[in-house]
Regions:
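Trp- and S/T/G-rich repeat-edge/linker motifs of beta-rich repeat architectures
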Residues: 1-8, 58-61, 67-70, 118-122, ...
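An edge-strand/N-cap motif at the start of beta-rich repeat modules
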Residues: 1-27, 31-39, 48, 63, ...
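Beta-rich catalytic cores
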Residues: 10, 19-20, 72, 79-80, ...
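Acidic glycine-/aspartate-rich tracts in secreted/extracellular proteins
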Residues: 29-31, 37-40, 68, 88-91, ...
Length: 189
């Protein structure tokens, strides 16, 4: 079975919440483990139990984040209370708090805090017709993906224009806001 050891050679990426509540690590095999505060399911364990504040919660006892059958992560990024993974085939999956649509599901339902919400049950973010991601990044309450065509799409809270869409309207928190309906960041030519 896959493990994340304490060896610095196995863990290839770490991402920490900007306010220090939780973190995630990705192994060289593409497996993800998250620890810390879990009030919104941001650890991806299917519950809201904090992990690492008691004995026997880390190491082999710390669960992997289920990303889906035969899926591995090539990158991870965490926001204040949500996390996203770029998967091996170019899809993006996000979980945790979703109060501003930062998970990109077209609603504000948090994911990862209950059973049957992760793994194959967790839908990928709709990036648009025939689009895949090559990089991901998260902010406090928003998420972005660099797409295979060189465009950038962002979703979530947009109170300061952080989505780069020419207005201050939040995206990803209602139907018909993702996929081809989500405008790419206009960076000029």
């Amino acid at each position: 079975s896959e493990t994340l050891s304490s060896s610095p050679y196995d863990v290839v990426e770490v991402s920490l919440s900007e306010i220090g509540k939780f973190g995630c690590a990705r192994s060289s095999q593409g497996h993800v483990k998250c620890w810390g505060y879990n009030g919104y399911g941001q650890l991806g364990h299917g519950n809201t139990s904090t992990a690492s504040d008691d004995e026997n919660e880390m190491g082999e006892d710390l669960a992997f984040v289920p990303l889906g059958s035969n899926r591995t992560a090539t990158s991870i990024s965490v926001g204040e209370n949500h996390a996203c993974a770029l998967l091996d085939e170019g899809s993006v999956k996000c979980w945790g708090r979703n109060n501003y649509g930062q998970l990109g599901m077209g609603n504000t339902t948090q994911i990862g805090d209950g059973p049957d919400e992760m793994g194959d049950f967790l839908a990928a973010v709709d990036l648009g017709t025939n689009r895949s991601a090559t990089e991901i990044a998260t902010g406090q309450h928003h998420s972005c993906a660099l797409l295979d065509d060189g465009s950038v799409k962002c979703w979530g809270l947009n109170n300061y224009g952080q989505l780069g869409i020419g207005n201050a309207s939040t995206r990803g928190n209602a139907a018909n806001q993702m996929g081809d309906d989500l405008v790419a960041v206009d960076l000029g030519t």
